[in-house]
Amino acid sequence: MPLPLYLLAVAVCAMGTSEFMLAGLVPDIASDLGVTVGTAGTLTSAFATGMIVGAPLVAALARTWPRRSSLLGFILAFAAAHAVGAGTTSFPVLVACRVVAALANAGFLAVALTTAAALVPADKQGRALAVLLSGTTVATVAGVPGGSLLGTWLGWRATFWAVAVCCLPAAFGVLKAIPAGRATAAATGGPPLRVELAALKTPRLLLAMLLGALVNAATFASFTFLAPVVTDTAGLGDLWISVALVLFGAGSFAGVTVAGRLSDRRPAQVLAVAGPLLLVGWPALAMLADRPVALLTLVFVQGALSFALGSTLITRVLYEAAGAPTMAGSYATAALNVGAAAGPLVAATTLGHTTGNLGPLWASGLLVAVALLVAFPFRTVITTAAPADATR
C-alpha cells in the first residue's frame, strides 16, 4: 500500500479519537455541565448528524479544490473546534463545537476515502479502505482509552485539548504526503455533479448504505453507553472503562484487518459469518454484563464482529458508487454516520426503564436483527459484483 495512505490513516486516527472518546467521558461531561447522562450522550448524535450533513455537502463543494488544501483545511478547522469546546462552560456551545468538528471530519473523511481509492488499483479498494480505517481502530485501541484516562485524571476538557494538539502532526503528515497539485476528478475531466448524485438512485447502493447504517447504529448504541455498564453493572472501577475501550479497539482492529483482506474477494463469507454472530453477541453481552470476565471478553468479540461487518458493507458502498468518483466517499461517510446518530438516540430511550444500563445492549441486538432481516431477501444482490465492478 502507498505511503500516503498510511499518513492519511494518521489523520483519521486523530479524528477517530474524537468521535469515539465520548464513550469514556459522558458521565464526567454530564456532571460538569449539569445535564443528564442521556443528554450528554446526544453529543455523539450531534457529531454524527454533522457528519451526515457535512459529508455530501462539503464533498460537493470541494470537488474542484486540490486534495491537499482540502484535507489540510479540514484538519485545522477540526482542531479549532476542539479548542473552543475545551474552554466552554455551556452545553449548547459544546454541542455546536461538536457539529462544527463533525463537518470538518466529514469533509476530510469524504475526500480521504476518494483519495485512498485513487491511490490503488480497483481490485485493491477493500485493502486500501482497511488501511484508512485502521486509523479509526488504532484510535479505539490507544487514543480513546488514553483520552478516557486523561479525562479521569485531569477532567474531560484535557482530553479535548489533547485532540486539538494531536491534529497538528496529522496536518503535517497530510502536508507532506499529498501532492499539492492533485485535484479531484471534477477538476480533471470527471463526471459532473448531477451524474454522481444520480448514483443515489441505484437500489444496490441504497441497500449497502442502509445495511451499513444499521450495523453502525448497533455499534454506537452500545459503545456510547459502555461506561455505566462497566462501572455500575459489572461493578468495576473507573479505570476499567479504559480497559474495556482498549479491548473493543483491539477487537475492531482485528476485525477490520481480517475483513480488509476478504471483502474484495469473499464479501458473502464475511457477511454470512459476522452477521449472525454479531446478532447473538449483543444479547449475550447484556445477559453476562454482571460477570467482568465475560463482559470484557464479549466487548473484544463484538468490536471485531462490528468492524468486520461494517467495513465490508462500506467497501460495497464504494464499489456500488464507482460512477461517482468524488462523491463515493461522502456516501460511505453518510451511511456510517446515519447509524452513529441513530444508535445513541435509540439507546437513550432505553435508559431508565426496566433494562437499566443494559438497554443499549438490547437495542443493539434489535438493530442487527433488523439489518439481517432486510439483507436476507437480497443476500445475493449485496455480495454480487455490479456491472461496473465486473468491467474494472
Swiss-Prot record:
Transmembrane spans: 6-26, 42-62, 71-91, 100-120, 129-149, 160-180, 205-225, 239-259, 268-288, 294-314, 332-352, 358-378
Membrane topology type: Multi-pass membrane protein
Protein's cellular compartments: Cell membrane
Organism: Streptomyces lividans
InterPro entries (UniProt xref): MFS, MFS_dom, MFS_Efflux_Transporters, MFS_trans_sf
GO MF, one annotated term: transmembrane transporter activity
Gene3D superfamilies: MFS general substrate transporter like domains
Family per similarity comment: Belongs to the major facilitator superfamily.
Protein name per its UniProtKB record: Chloramphenicol resistance protein
Signal peptide coordinates: none
Source organism, top-level taxon: Bacteria
BP GO annotations: response to antibiotic
Main location: membrane
The encoding gene: cmlR
GO cellular component: plasma membrane
UniProt KW keywords: Antibiotic resistance, Cell membrane, Membrane, Transmembrane, Transmembrane helix, Transport
